[in-house]
Amino acid sequence: MHHRGRQLRRTMLAVVLGGLVLGWSVPAGAQTRESSPSVSTETSVSQLSPLAEPRPEPQDQLLTPSEPTPRGGVPLLRRFVPGLADFMKELPPFLRDTSVNLHLRSFYFNRLNSDESQNEAWAFGGWLEYRSGWLLDTFRIGGVGYTSQPLYAPEDSPGTNLLHPPQDPILTLGQLYAQFRYKEYALVTGYRQLVDEGYVNLHDTRMVPFTYEGVTIKGELGRFGYNVGYLTALKQRQEETFHDIAGVAGARGSDAGLILTRLSAEPIKGLDLYGANYYIKDVYNTAYANVEFKHEIVKDLSLQIGVQFTDQRSVGDHLVGDFSTLSFGTRGGFLWRGLTAGAAIYTTDSGAALKTPFGSWPGYLSFQEKDFDRAGENAWGVGAKYDFGAGSLLPFNIPGLTVLLRYATGTDARNTGATHGALPRVTEGDLDITWNIPWVKGLQLRFRNAYVDDGGRDVPVKAFRIILNYDIPVL
């Protein structure tokens, strides 16, 4: 890491540590009280800081499912340690509203590739999260340690990204941050943090999510939301250490960071507008826009349509090559008595495939194994999801259970190398079953299965994942 990056990290770390000292010295009545951590604090925090953005939630996007992990119940220590809850009420707010959360995850991954090689591992781990209360209703700190430990990891079948390559454990301090806020207008976060903004996101599809080093400021100004940031480094899901943003993008030797800008709005009920830009000096720029509209036609029947557009091109010294590409996608669907169904189409310019080194592709046709975003590719997909808990189409209910089926195919893709040859047709079918077990709050079981015909290959790709999440509030 270059000198400038090291100095920035030291400054942000000093701010985090300084907050610990200040937190002890402020009296208990010095700020507006948050909700007691004996109940979920997410609601109270979102009312005072811009944590909820006016853009589509992933689980509402039919063809890009991301089922939320349920939150756990009352914190264990406050429930079972006599007098602890009452004692903490008398502490300064910085300590009184402290939360500690343990998230356990078990993940089994098995994929048979078209060349008959195999990727297989079973890992156990998760993360431990600390978050302070607000000091003077303005400042707080937090940190998250992540781990992934191999339970079964054959040496001859690496490549799952559950573990550090080839099959080694992961132990890392993925988040360590300080935050300043002013009402809902501004929330400044410095140092190691989560970022979830279109092409820069968590990519939380294995044991450990992507986390970033940098500074961001986001907020809400009336109907508008914004986020502006400068990100210097990224820790990928299979890594323990952070690497320069430009290096992750392929520009080795460059210390350029990523400038993130986002503007979103909800001008009328049901209409969500989202636009973002991601710029890396001398590497490339990505501009992304997403419009979603959801409208209830009659009771229990809603229609939903969406449009996405991406412009991506090299800039400056073209450190990763001179290229430009565009992509466009649209989708439509309906929600009726617990059933969600619809279709999407996507087309990508022949200039280049989309580059997505900072997370998963946010497109409608991002599937379990394949992203249908190759150069020149034209793709379409259909899907249906049913909520067995809230749905009323069937004569029975299974609380917490959702099932998703989806199918997509992509054609006309081309190699952008010297040959410019045609690439084979790709088809994928997915089954995704998620069960938020109702009698154990915070416990989720998920099964994901994919079948991929990679065009012209004798052996299809077969992959399945078994995932267990258990969220346990500790304090």
Predicted regions mapped to residue ranges:
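N-terminal periplasmic/intermembrane-space "pro-region" immediately following the signal or transit peptide
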Residues: 2-125, 129-136, 337-340
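Short loop/turn motifs that connect adjacent beta-strands in outer-membrane beta-barrel proteins
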Residues: 33, 77, 81-100, 131-142, ...
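Residues that define the transmembrane beta-barrel architecture of outer-membrane proteins
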Residues: 96, 120-124, 170-174, 209-213, ...
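Transmembrane beta-strand segments that form the barrel wall of outer-membrane beta-barrel proteins
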Residues: 104-108, 188-202, 226-228, 232, ...
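Solvent-exposed loop/turn segments connecting transmembrane beta-strands
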Residues: 114-120, 182, 202-209, 233-236, ...
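Outer membrane beta-barrel
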Residues: 130-243, 263-271, 339, 343-351
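Outer-membrane beta-barrel translocator/channel fold
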Residues: 227-258, 300-375, 379, 449-464
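Outer-membrane beta-barrel "beta-signal"
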Residues: 261, 382, 406, 435, ...
